């Protein structure tokens, strides 16, 4: 049966458990539109990513 050779220290145990914490998602303010978006994701309102037009957003008709 596999048994640890040394006792795991409190610090090492804490480092391992820190990855289990639930963290709030990160948002950044878009430079062009001023909208909040996730980093490294396309801005859904404008369709831009890193200065390039990825797609043209659909215009929603309000009735």
UniProtKB/Swiss-Prot annotation:
One of its GO terms (molecular function) is structural constituent of ribosome. The keyword Ligase does not apply. Keywords: Ribonucleoprotein, Ribosomal protein. Residues 1-22 are annotated as: Disordered. Residues 1-16 have a biased composition (Basic residues). GO terms for biological process: translation. Pfam families: Ribosomal_L32p (PF01783). Transmembrane segments: none annotated. It comes from the Bacteria. Gene3D superfamilies: Single helix bin. InterPro entries: Ribosomal_bL32, Ribosomal_bL32_bact, Ribosomal_zn-bd. GO terms for cellular component: large ribosomal subunit. The keyword Transport does not apply. HAMAP family: Ribosomal_bL32 (MF_00340). Belongs to the bacterial ribosomal protein bL32 family. This is Large ribosomal subunit protein bL32. It comes from Beijerinckia indica subsp. indica (strain ATCC 9039 / DSM 1715 / NCIMB 8712).
């Amino acid at each position: 049966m596999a048994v640890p050779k040394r006792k795991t220290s409190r610090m090492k145990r804490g480092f391992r458990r820190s990855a289990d914490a639930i963290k709030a998602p990160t948002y950044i303010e878009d430079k062009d539109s001023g909208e909040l978006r996730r980093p490294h994701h396309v801005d859904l309102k404008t369709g831009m990513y890193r200065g390039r037009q990825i797609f043209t957003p659909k215009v929603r008709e309000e009735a």
